[in-house]
């Protein structure tokens, strides 16, 4: 039983195709503090590791370990790792498991070419952070390969390099054949950023380019991180819950309604007009005053809900604009000018009170311009360029990358192939919207 209800808000929940699932669900049923699916998702993100057994076999056969351009001639090992995937998986499970009834899970995928490892929660409980998942799995995997193929002490370092790449001298594990959704803790921008350390392409790959699920996954991780960072606390908790509900989970079918209204002939500007109309209809904003020119200014009736509506509109604008182009490159300018137009049109603050718009200025430069260091898909909420918005800027990027028709050099297929193959085989990673709604229905009557 949840001891107290803080907010009177209720939402209607829809699936990824815009079909009503449940009406009048308490807002707190989708809170990371109460929703069992979100809690499981966060836990599984931390304890799940993707292993590329075919990649390890190829690295050892060619001597190409430690990243691009690193090849050690004369140190090749021809080991039939994929052929013996079941033996290796059994050994890894034996080493990783703590007790017979714990939640350890080892799953071979794609005829043994890849493997999903979920370490037991007990190992996570006695760790300070999530590195334990990769490091324990890697150690068990190295031992399994060494024991299975009787690798001697002189060749064992090659097994290490094939599994962990350049680690430990390269802390990002460049060239490794093991991966987690969360990036290295050593790359965190500051305290509390860990759950935001997932590139947009990973969300796209995990959900197999399903727009609504990718947006949901991104929003869940970004907004759950706000609880860790201390942003979604006190007066600001409701703002973040509404943002998660409307932008991430398509509450009241707002995102899909806006896309339907503008999908055929719409632009970013017409999406803005639709958001304003819907907000007026729903009593979220109201007319404030009319200037001598006839221009109308608005004021919020509920500022947190206005932000949620604006954030949902931002995702809709991304879907309409990037979807029309079949390309993701314009997502930075879409985030920027959606907010710019919205502010000029209404006199109200843009998404996240200007932080999404400000993020988009730097995002435009660093994904285009004279720098152009990476496409939109490689950015995340922990990136120095895109960290500034409090959870509202990454979901539209995930939407845009789902709609890209192969125009990106940094495509999900290039950056997230292993992650996508392994994590998409796990239901709640592939269809987070469905399972978060299921979790909300489990707890709604207890609130």
From Swiss-Prot:
Pfam families: MCR_beta, MCR_beta_N. Its cofactor is coenzyme F430. One of its GO terms (biological process) is methanogenesis. InterPro entries: Me_CoM_Rdtase_asu/bsu_C, Me_CoM_Rdtase_asu_N_sub2, Me_CoM_Rdtase_bsu, Me_CoM_Rdtase_bsu_C, Me_CoM_Rdtase_bsu_N, Me_CoM_Rdtase_Fd-like_fold. Binds 2 coenzyme F430 non-covalently per MCR complex. Coenzyme F430 is a yellow nickel porphinoid. Methyl-coenzyme-M reductase is activated when the enzyme-bound coenzyme F430 is reduced to the Ni(I) oxidation state. It catalyses: coenzyme B + methyl-coenzyme M = methane + coenzyme M-coenzyme B heterodisulfide. GO terms for cellular component: cytoplasm. Pathway: One-carbon metabolism; methyl-coenzyme M reduction; methane from methyl-coenzyme M: step 1/1. It is an enzyme of class 2 (transferase). Keywords: Cytoplasm, Methanogenesis, Transferase. The keyword Transferase applies. GO terms for molecular function: coenzyme-B sulfoethylthiotransferase activity. Its EC number is 2.8.4.1. Coenzyme B binds at residue 373. Gene3D superfamilies: 3.30.70.470, Methyl-coenzyme M reductase, alpha/beta subunit, C-terminal. Coenzyme M binds at residue 371. It is found in: Cytoplasm. MCR is a hexamer of two alpha, two beta, and two gamma chains, forming a dimer of heterotrimers. NCBIfam families: met_CoM_red_bet. Belongs to the methyl-coenzyme M reductase beta subunit family. Component of the methyl-coenzyme M reductase (MCR) I that catalyzes the reductive cleavage of methyl-coenzyme M (CoM-S-CH3 or 2-(methylthio)ethanesulfonate) using coenzyme B (CoB or 7-mercaptoheptanoylthreonine phosphate) as reductant which results in the production of methane and the mixed heterodisulfide of CoB and CoM (CoM-S-S-CoB). This is the final step in methanogenesis. This is Methyl-coenzyme M reductase I subunit beta.
């Amino acid at each position: 039983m949840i001891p107290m209800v803080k907010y009177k808000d209720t939402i209607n929940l829809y699936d990824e195709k815009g079909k009503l699932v449940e009406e009048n669900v308490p807002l707190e049923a989708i809170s990371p503090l109460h929703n069992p699916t979100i809690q499981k998702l966060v836990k599984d993100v931390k304890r799940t590791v993707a292993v590329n057994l075919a990649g390890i076999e190829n690295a050892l056969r060619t001597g190409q370990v430690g990243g691009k351009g690193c090849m050690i001639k004369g140190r090749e090992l021809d080991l039939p790792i994929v052929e013996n995937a079941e033996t290796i998986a059994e050994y890894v499970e034996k080493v990783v498991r703590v007790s017979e009834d714990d939640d350890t899970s080892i799953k071979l995928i794609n005829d043994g070419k890849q493997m999903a490892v979920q370490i037991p929660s007990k190992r996570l409980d006695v760790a300070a952070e999530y590195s334990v998942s990769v490091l324990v799995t890697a150690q068990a995997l190295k031992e399994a390969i060494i024991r299975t193929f009787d690798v001697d002490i002189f060749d064992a370092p090659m097994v290490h390099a094939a599994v962990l790449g350049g680690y430990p001298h390269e802390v990002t594990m460049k060239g490794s054949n093991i991966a987690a959704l969360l990036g290295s803790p050593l790359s965190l921008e500051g305290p509390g950023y860990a759950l935001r350390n997932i590139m947009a392409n990973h969300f796209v790959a995990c959900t197999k380019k399903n727009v609504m699920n990718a947006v949901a996954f991104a929003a869940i991780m970004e907004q759950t991180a706000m609880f860790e960072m201390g942003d979604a606390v006190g007066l600001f908790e409701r703002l973040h819950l509404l943002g998660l509900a409307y932008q991430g989970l398509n509450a009241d079918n707002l995102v899909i309604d806006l896309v339907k209204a503008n999908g055929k002939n719409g632009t970013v500007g017409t999406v803005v007009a639709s958001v304003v109309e819907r907000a007026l209809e729903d009593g979220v904003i109201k007319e404030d005053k009319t200037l001598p020119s006839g221009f109308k200014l608005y004021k919020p009736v509920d500022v947190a809900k206005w932000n949620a509506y604006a954030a949902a509109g931002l995702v809709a604008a991304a879907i309409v604009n990037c979807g029309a182009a079949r390309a993701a490159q314009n997502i930075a300018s879409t985030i920027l000018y959606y907010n710019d137009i919205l502010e000029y049109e209404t006199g109200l603050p843009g998404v996240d009170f200007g932080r999404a718009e400000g993020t988009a200025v730097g995002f435009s430069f660093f994904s285009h311009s004279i720098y152009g260091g990476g496409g939109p898909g490689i950015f995340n909420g922990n990136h120095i360029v895109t960290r500034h918005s409090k959870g509202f800027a990454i979901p539209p990027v995930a939407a845009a990358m789902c709609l890209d028709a192969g125009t990106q050099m940094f495509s999900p297929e290039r950056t997230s192939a292993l992650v996508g193959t392994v994590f998409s085989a796990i239901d709640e990673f592939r269809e987070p919207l469905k399972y978060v709604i299921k979790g909300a229905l489990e707890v709604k009557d207890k609130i």
